[in-house]
Amino acid sequence: CAGGKLDPTAIRVADLAKTTQDPLLAKIRASLRKNHSFCRDLKRPLGISAIYSIEPRQGKATGGLACSGYGSAVTVTAAFGFAATSTCLNQITNR
């Protein structure tokens, strides 16, 4: 989730099991392990690429916005989109 993030250089691509600083990805990871028979070993990769930011959230939630009320800087949301597109294209072309 890009909410509450300001630094586009903190975006990373990694296996879903290795992501940090993202409560939404943590919920997805827990759901996959609990409801869909994914490996419960926290040290093993899940085999799913995820785009996330290592930057802690900035500011306080104000409510009513996406990502639990945190706003987003356009530079961060754009960088998330570019990272996601690059990851998809690399996987499609097997790089």
Regions found by a protein language model. Name each.
Residues A10, A17-R95:
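Glycine-rich phosphate/adenylate-binding loop
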Residues C1-A2, I54:
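Short secondary-structure boundary segments
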Residues A2-P8:
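Short gly/pro/ser/thr-enriched loop/turn and capping motifs at secondary-structure boundaries
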